[in-house]
Amino acid sequence: MAFYSEDDKSEDYLFKIVLIGDSAVGKSNLLARFARDEFYPNSKSTIGVEFQTQKMDINGKEIKAQIWDTAGQERFRAVTSAYYRGAVGALLVYDISRRQTFHSIGRWLNELHTHSDMNVVTILVGNKSDLKDLREVSTAEGKALAEAQGLFFMETSALDSSNVAAAFETVVKEIYNILSRKVMSSQELNKQDPASLSNGKKVVIPSDGQGEFKKGGCCSS
């Protein structure tokens, strides 16, 4: 998968992806590591709306991932429906060293389904895998929850960058694959180049066939 800078040619697709999960699980550092290869060990909770973009190439098509951070709103249980609007992918993040953040996953998943399409491609992310001596949630527990909910799964470390790019790429690739299958199966569009559908506009995938995004898949750290 190739990456591009913001100055390169306009993208074929724009996918909105949201980061959700309890405060201080490392969402902002995951985004910083993926988008800018940076890490802030003493970072405070995000304040204000923030999103970053990253371009990548999949099968010769240029994809721009527009990745949104909750901007600290989760501390006040005030993540709004506008945050989720138009999202086609999500990273649902917990901290492997804080079991309570794992227990909150069900609430975040319900909120995601309430405010967005049920078919949003979602990966469950156990962050801070570098904190091995402080681990409170086992890899097996994370995998089991992901399998039960039909989610992808991966453990990451924003500190040492383990699996960070892979987690985002998993979501983007699955969104693209699903969109490509929909284009190929459409009688009206089967002779067109899939890139002609979006050409730089946000992609919102129709919600027919609710199980289509639920391609349970697991990757451990």
UniProtKB/Swiss-Prot annotation:
Superkingdom of this protein's organism: Eukaryota
The entry's GTP-binding residues are 21-28, 69-73, 127-130, 157-158
Instruction: Give the motif span (Effector region).
Output: 43-51
One GO biological process this protein is involved in is: protein transport
Q: Keywords in alphabetical order, please.
A: Cell membrane, GTP-binding, Lipoprotein, Membrane, Nucleotide-binding, Prenylation, Protein transport, Transport
| Family note | Belongs to the small GTPase superfamily. Rab family.
This protein is called Ras-related protein RABA5a
Source organism of the structure: Arabidopsis thaliana (Mouse-ear cress)
Organism placement in taxonomy: Eukaryota, Viridiplantae, Streptophyta, Embryophyta, Tracheophyta
